[in-house]
Amino acid sequence: MLLVSPACRGVYLQTIDPKPIDFSARASYALCFQIPTSIPKRECLMRLGTVFCFNQKHREQTSFKKRYVSTQNVDLPPILPKNKKKPYPIPFKQIQEEARKDKKLAQMGIEKQLDPPKNGLLVPNLVPVADQVIDNWKLLIKGLAQLLHVVPVFACSECGAVHVANVGHNIRDCNGPTNSQRRGSHSWVKGTINDVLIPVESYHMYDPFGRRIKHETRFEYERIPALVELCIQAGVEIPEYPCRRRTQPIRMMGKRVIDRGGYHKEPEKPQTSSSLSSPLAELDTLGVFERYPPPTPEDIPKIAQETMDAYEKVRLGVTKLMRKFTVKACGYCSEVHVGPWGHSVKLCGEFKHQWRDGKHGWQDALVDEVFPPNYVWHVRDLKGNPLTGNLRRFYGKAPALVEICMHSGARVPQRYKAMMRLDIIVPDSQEADMVA
């Protein structure tokens, strides 16, 4: 037998050379049959022999890791319509297929195989990640509060638009309730830290796998930042917000929990002072301007770079935690719940909430829903002319915190430069009219 390169198709005639054949290490070969050389010359077209290559299946090419190629410009983040449900992060067919498998196993009486943290146990490798997220979250709040004393920030009182400059822009894209009276112009007021770091809160639960939060019992649970609640369930110990640490995994059959280790009552919380100097106040943005004074001009670039690095570390840490821990988000509003399933509080007032009796439409959450970036228009000069609507196609966007840190002297991460469109020269109004 002779090995033949896969380049052959059907029947291939080849003379056999007595010399050794060098085969390529990258190519694939198939087994073929050789006709003996004793065949008479009149019955064979070749003198030494004939090789037949049979049907060979095409081998699938091995997948290689794609190299990151930096693009010149990327599209601006889309604005999702409010009269439609958010798209599912996971394809709906895949969700249905997994549900059918779980239902089939439940009908056969087979328990669902759960890995940490889906079974209520901690993941030891993610505990340091959660600690780093909390530490960088505190540093992020402190640095941003100091930079807001230096960099001017404006927010629209009618919608959620934010602008980083000495004056507000003139782009008429306000979607507030009275935008028709102002012809789409924004109503600018002085911005706060909550306009840059959008507060996303969730209910703190002592046992995420315990009883669900009902509409009547919603006031028995505290509301804390969803990012902090995610870190607490990942292993961060905060005495004011205790969390149950299981030693035995829970057992599920389909969607039903058959063994959760019983219900435990939440222990009494230690009494803490409500002053702004308490350790718990460092996790919240309430009263940050009173806690942190304006920085000196020499420290501004250093604080800006530390704040930028903390922002990237927080986002990276939240991404790692959400790959393992379940976080649910409403498909219609901005409500977020950290836990294996959502709560039953009827406070959704968005699209078609009457049909759902105010209940939330839970689906898997994205990182931008737990830690929203809040994109703003990129301004190259804070003291320059305000942005106009007829030149908006030449403007870029960036997260509000990145824009503030950049104007304070921090280096812009590479992944934001394409969206900011730093390589585009913004023309004058008359030059823009002549552009084809």
Curated annotation (Swiss-Prot):
Domain APO: 155-240, 329-414
Compartments reported by the entry: Plastid, Chloroplast
Pfam families: APO_RNA-bind
Xref: PANTHER family: EUKARYOTIC TRANSLATION INITIATION FACTOR SUI1
Range annotated as the organelle transit peptide: 1-47
Family: Belongs to the APO family.
A GO molecular-function descriptor: RNA binding
Job description of the protein: Involved in the stable assembly of several 4Fe-4S cluster-containing complexes of chloroplasts. May participate in 4Fe-4S cofactor incorporation into psaA and/or psaB during translation.
Entry keyword annotation includes Chloroplast: yes
Protein name in UniProt: APO protein 1, chloroplastic
InterPro entries for the chain: APO_dom
Induction statement: Up-regulated during photomorphogenesis.
Tissue: Expressed at low level. Expressed at higher level in leaves. Expressed at lower level in roots, stems, siliques and flowers.
Mutant phenotype after disruption: Plants fail to accumulate significant amounts of the outer antenna subunits of PSI and PSII and to form grana stacks. 2Fe-2S cluster-containing complexes appear to be unaffected.
Keywords, alphabetical: Chloroplast, Plastid, Repeat, Transit peptide
GO CC entries: chloroplast
Notes concerning its domains: The APO repeats may provide ligands for 4Fe-4S centers.
Encoding gene (name): APO1
